[in-house]
């Protein structure tokens, strides 16, 4: 799936579809967060129709799971044309959900603006001291203009801050380069270190060191669930969210995003879902690049045991999970996994008629550093020249250890 300029991407829906067409992509899921504007949907579907691309609408929601959030991608299905999608968005229950989603985005925006205030009050001085540049007071109004119609996020805040600091860094770097020309051998080493230090001030560093939620614990986080003043949609549990989504559109695909989850988490969520989770996003390229995909093999083995209706293998997997310290030493979770062992036939029954599907996401955004672009390709379907390029040893090459 990919993102357009209304969320985390760079391109508006029309240019996104045109780009997909040029790259040979014929099926595309465009993802939005918590809600989607009907005007955006109209542009997306009309552009896809003109370019001959099959497009699907995906909306990402969060649900409370223990002391954190898990994410689901809701993909309503069964639309015949643009009008049918727009009619669906006008239905009372869908409209109510979209309105609640807007409230979530408004709340999240305020948290980001609070982070900007903290940056001005505290972090700017730290950067000025460490990098030797005069950090200006950053304007919330300028930041909102920078974001435009896109989503107000900490990632975009990182890029905005970087855009304001970059001219200062470049000016300082030019001064250092001039000093290097006439510096003594002893001073050259110090000046080169100074130059290298200036190169380190990237949007990624700004996010990791000063802007991510863990660096500003006084501000409510979208990463951790809490019973505070956040909108009700951010307080709903897994069962409540899935029930609501399936009630609104029974012919829906609900994909569990597994990037930050263990196989034990996935099993527990499948149990809570009672068959309403139709797919697992086994691999997300953005999450992989960030080093968050740590249990891919184990999750895939769990999925295969369920889809093959292999009760013996599923029992072995659950027993192994049960022996882990984080489960064995937690009375509540230990009891839950005992319940799983007693209900293996029921777990298998969730996917007796329709297997638990797999999804692979490029999650293309082009934001905060280098990421893979949109889409995947099967090597055997490519021209021989392209296959030879793939076969060459490269740091970019890797195999996906999946069975589907």
Indicate where each model-derived feature is located.
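Non-catalytic, alpha-helical, charged scaffold/linker segments
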Residues: 84-196
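Phosphate-binding glycine-rich loops of NTP-binding sites
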Residues: 30
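Charged catalytic cores and adjacent phosphate/nucleic-acid-binding surfaces used
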Residues: 2-27, 35-97, 103, 166-185, ...
